[in-house]
Amino acid sequence: MRSVYLASAVALSLVSMLGSTAVHAADDCKSRGELDTNYCDEDNNLVAQAPKDKAKWKDPSTLVFAYTPIEDPAVYANLFKDFTEYLGTYTQKKIVYYTVQSNAAQIEAMRSGRLHVAGLASGETGLAANLAGAVPFAIKGNKDGPRMYRQFVVVKKESNIKTIADLKGRKVAHTAPSSNSGHLAPLALFPKEGVTPGKDYNIVFSGKHDQSLAGVLKEDYEAAPITSDIYDRWIMRGQMKADDTRIIYRSGTFPTSSFAHAHDLTPVLADKIKKCFFDYKFSPEMQKEFLGDDRFLPVDYKKDWKLVRGVALASGTPYNRAQFDKENAKKK
């Protein structure tokens, strides 16, 4: 099956006309935990269960796939081409790659039923699970286990910033409101280092991790918290040298991007998608770009994202609609 690459929400909405409908509220739900009112979690695994009404299950002829916009989306559209072709053959579905421009757009697309399978940034995963009915099931990794990452705080080599305490009064770029390493972790962790983001320095949102890193190199920003994955990839690609910057802070490890399916796909289709992921072996290009990862591994969102959820709570940014709207209003 061939994959089709579309870059606009207009094209994506056209796909939705082919069989997707908006998610309906689970009025007869006995327990939904932290999930939005559209979803139900009676088995207490912190993700939305399939609708009780089988008439609401979806088996679309076209599957829409998107990957988190942590960098220029075009990079990943090409990178995932081999995989989306494999997914199309495996499921016997037409695959549309949706080039999303923001985490918020990706979450809204899945919430509205226009996105079926997605690679989600670590911090975005909780929002997508609670607000969009995303069911995380996989993570990148290799024979040694799943990919983990750290939050780095990066400054220009010549900068006089040596510690987190030196960020007071400086121009510091965060990435996006839902980003774990680019926003939520700094809110939760920096106060222990004597600095409160938004109080001791004004938060400027760059939009993406690569834009934060580029901004530091161009001296648009004096410092930026980013994911170690992007930092390492830039060095691997030759986009910068290791001694162009200094890392003044390294956090503990977090799980990297998850892969999730929409909660209302038919169980047969959802299982087929998961099996496809776990059977797939990364192309040489993917292995290089993902720093040696060569496979997808299963994850348990309740257990494996406990630390990330804890960071969100500690930062005062719970995974709910009110906070999501509040933070995105700040970004605008």
Predicted features by range, described:
Residues 8-19:
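Bacterial N-terminal signal peptides
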Residues 10, 23-105, 289-332:
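N-terminal hydrophobic or amphipathic helices and topogenic motifs
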Residues 65-88, 123, 146-214, 221, ...:
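Bilobed "Venus flytrap"/periplasmic-binding protein-like clamshell domains
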Residues 68, 143-152, 239-277, 287-307:
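Periplasmic-binding protein-like
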Residues 88-99, 191-206, 242-244, 321, ...:
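A local structural motif
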Residues 104-118, 131, 165, 209-229:
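Short helices/loops that flank or line small-molecule/ion binding pockets
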Residues 108-166:
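Acidic, polar ligand-binding/catalytic clefts
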Residues 128-140, 234-248:
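Ligand-binding "clamshell"
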